[in-house]
């Protein structure tokens, strides 16, 4: 009898506590942030993710009235800093500003966390399409001609990437499968050396980060025939998308802002709303266009769906191509 009464009292206490828990979560969202927020960028200073973070978070600080302090925590292709955030308290005061390898690393490295379980995608601040570039001495003048040449000479076109398992390598593997071609993959140690050798004529073709290669295209040092994004892009409005020819093809380098998985929904939604406003700021939008970055308004659900689809897509490509790090 005592056990029965104890059980009833526990159940009644839990029931009575539920509204107060709900009110507590709401309160967490309403007064957040009331102190500085730490933003972990798991990449070196001056890189793409760091550049984007330093465009966005000062504006976010102005909007929300608290500092957003960027800490660079590079290592293991972003995994060290990401794991640190995944283990952090889910209170909205530690965020992660990460990049494309977040969706690639689980299939190539030993990582100590699951981004789809231990982290919550909040917002996609940018996507950067890649440009299919080549040395101007190469014969093709269009995407169709590149594909036709590759089909006529299977395995003979030298195609650079910024390294095994890089976003550029995966974009290439996705492209060759969609086009039904084979090429000779030439991995470099970074995109800079790869683009340098395309300019010098040492290697023929490359999927290059658009904000890096666009000045070379504009200066006539490389030829671009297509981009890996969707539709027309403001920074290069006359360049067609590969997806216009190969239906469904799409590949980006991107950044994603995330929080520990159990961060209150009210905080996540407040952050998403504020970030959507920040990227529409005229100064930020102009800088995005200058850097050939694409930003589209996105909800928490859309950011989450994107991260999941990227993880599934690149995992499939890595398995099919049997990609391994040397």
Give the positions of each predicted feature.
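C-terminal lobe and pocket-closing loops
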Residues: 127, 213-281, 309-312
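Short coil/turn segments
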Residues: 46, 100, 135-140, 161-166, ...
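Hinge/capping helix and adjacent helix->loop/strand transition within the periplasmic-binding protein
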Residues: 87-92, 108-193, 242, 254-287
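Immediate post-signal peptide segment of exported/extracytoplasmic ligand-binding proteins
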Residues: 26-38, 89-93, 147-157, 218-221, ...
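An extracytoplasmic/periplasmic, membrane-proximal ligand-sensing/linker region
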Residues: 34-36, 178, 218, 265-326
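N-terminal export signals
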Residues: 4, 10-27
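Beta->alpha turn/N-cap motifs
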Residues: 97-102, 126, 161, 191, ...
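N-terminal (or domain-start) structured segment
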Residues: 27-117, 156, 181-204, 297, ...
